[in-house]
Regions:
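Extended, aromatic/histidine-rich regions of cofactor-dependent oxidoreductases associated
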Residues: 1-42, 46, 102-249
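Short N-terminal helix-initiation segments at or just after the protein's N-terminus
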Residues: 16-22, 53-58, 96
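A glycine-rich, hydrophobic loop/mini-helix early in the fold
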Residues: 34-91
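Residue-level marker of positions within ordered structural domains that often coincide
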Residues: 53, 82, 98, 160, ...
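Short acidic (Asp/Glu) patches
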Residues: 59-63, 92-98, 137-140
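Mid-length scaffold segments of soluble, non-membrane domains
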Residues: 74-122
Length: 249
């Protein structure tokens, strides 16, 4: 089977970052890709905890009071696949931070841990979280987010690999130093993430795939693991991706 699955591996197309290849579809992927979608509460909110004067809840409806932003950006998975020109809509996280969160924050915030309804979390440095292109998005390609892509709202940080883009956002914890378990989950998933040792910055342009290992050493491993899974996620179109250029890196 790997004979034809290997043909699916996206070849490097012009303009993509190091180690990335282009695919046609935008599959649900990640640590939780095979799990049932989380249940969204009738009135979703973001719990704000950690280094704040008083913990509070921020209803997602509060996003309606902030200026809307549209962002067209590529999405890059740490496993090596990319999709181009996704149209995200939402609010700039910087605007949400300055309007609703920073007034309650204690001095010296260095990291923010975003957690979703599915229990997955990612830790961003305050510098990365406040970048101009980081959104809390509720729409993708002209339609409300589906469960596969993070409904009701998710983090979109295009300069970082997908594992920093927490879906189903429901909790934000402020820290004054790097959390010991920056990416937290439970059971088998926690073990998997500790083995993978994700990079704390995960910047695509620097190919920061792993906390300790050089990026090139992971490309073959990720391809061996991800190829069969990607084939099943692409469904009936898996055997006929659109032509890509032949420059492989």
């Amino acid at each position: 089977m790997l004979g034809h699955v290997r043909d699916l591996w996206p070849r490097r197309a012009g303009g993509l970052p190091p180690g990335q290849g282009l695919v046609d579809t935008f599959p649900r992927f990640g640590v939780h890709f095979a799990s049932p979608l989380p249940v969204v509460p009738p009135e979703p909110a973001i719990e704000v905890r950690g280094a704040v004067t008083t913990p509070f809840e921020l209803p997602l409806s509060a996003l309606d009071e902030l200026p809307r932003r549209t962002l067209v950006a590529d999405f890059h998975c740490v496993a090596g696949w990319s999709v181009r020109d996704r149209h995200w809509e939402g609010v700039a996280f910087r605007a949400l931070w300055e309007e609703s969160i920073a007034p309650h924050a204690q001095p010296g915030i260095t990291h923010l841990v975003f957690t979703g309804l599915d229990g997955y979390g990612s830790a961003l440095t305050i510098e990365d979280a406040l970048a101009d292109d980081v959104l809390i998005a509720d729409r993708l390609d002209g339609a409300p987010l589906t469960g596969d892509h993070g409904a009701p709202a998710r983090v979109v940080s295009p300069q970082q690999y997908g594992y920093m883009n927490t879906k189903h956002l429901s909790r934000l914890v402020l820290h004054t130093r790097e959390p010991e378990r920056a990416r937290h989950s439970s059971g088998v998933r926690a073990f998997m993430l500790s083995f993978v040792a994700p990079h704390p910055r995960a910047r695509v342009a620097h190919e920061e795939r792993h906390r300790h290992l050089p990026a090139w050493s992971l490309r073959f491993t990720y391809q061996r693991i991800v190829l069969p899974i990607l084939a099943t996620r692409m469904g009936p179109n898996a055997r006929s991706p659109r032509p890509l250029d032949d420059h492989v890196t």
